[in-house]
Amino acid sequence: MKPNIHPDNYRTVLFFDSSANEGWLIRSCAETHGKTMVWTDGKEYPLFSLDTSSASHPVYTGKQRNVNTEGHASKFNQRFQSVMSSFRKDK
């Protein structure tokens, strides 16, 4: 790595996904606002909290929710059926 090309706050940061209870140590300049956490190696690292990651996102975990599109289409048709029938009567 070339010297003097990274900002002063380039350090090891713990990125932690609380919903999956998983974390990763990555060198980063991410702002952690003074939050820290003790990791499994016993050392304390700056903490960057994640709402979702590959460990918890349904696309990556395979736990996707199937949406019943037929139900959505029938609701749409019911809602606008009266509008469409009055439109057809006017012509």
Curated annotation (Swiss-Prot):
<comment type="subunit">
    <text>Part of the 50S ribosomal subunit.</text>
</comment>
<dbReference type="GO" id="GO:0006412">
    <property type="term" value="P:translation"/>
</dbReference>
<dbReference type="InterPro" id="IPR034704">
    <property type="entry name" value="Ribosomal_bL28/bL31-like_sf"/>
</dbReference>
<dbReference type="GO" id="GO:1990904">
    <property type="term" value="C:ribonucleoprotein complex"/>
</dbReference>
<dbReference type="InterPro" id="IPR042105">
    <property type="entry name" value="Ribosomal_bL31_sf"/>
</dbReference>
<protein>
    <recommendedName>
        <fullName>Large ribosomal subunit protein bL31B</fullName>
    </recommendedName>
</protein>
<keyword id="KW-0687">Ribonucleoprotein</keyword>
<comment type="similarity">
    <text>Belongs to the bacterial ribosomal protein bL31 family. Type B subfamily.</text>
</comment>
<dbReference type="GO" id="GO:0003735">
    <property type="term" value="F:structural constituent of ribosome"/>
</dbReference>
<dbReference type="GO" id="GO:0005840">
    <property type="term" value="C:ribosome"/>
</dbReference>
<dbReference type="InterPro" id="IPR027493">
    <property type="entry name" value="Ribosomal_bL31_B"/>
</dbReference>
<dbReference type="InterPro" id="IPR002150">
    <property type="entry name" value="Ribosomal_bL31"/>
</dbReference>
<keyword id="KW-0689">Ribosomal protein</keyword>
<dbReference type="Pfam" id="PF01197">
    <property type="entry name" value="Ribosomal_L31"/>
</dbReference>
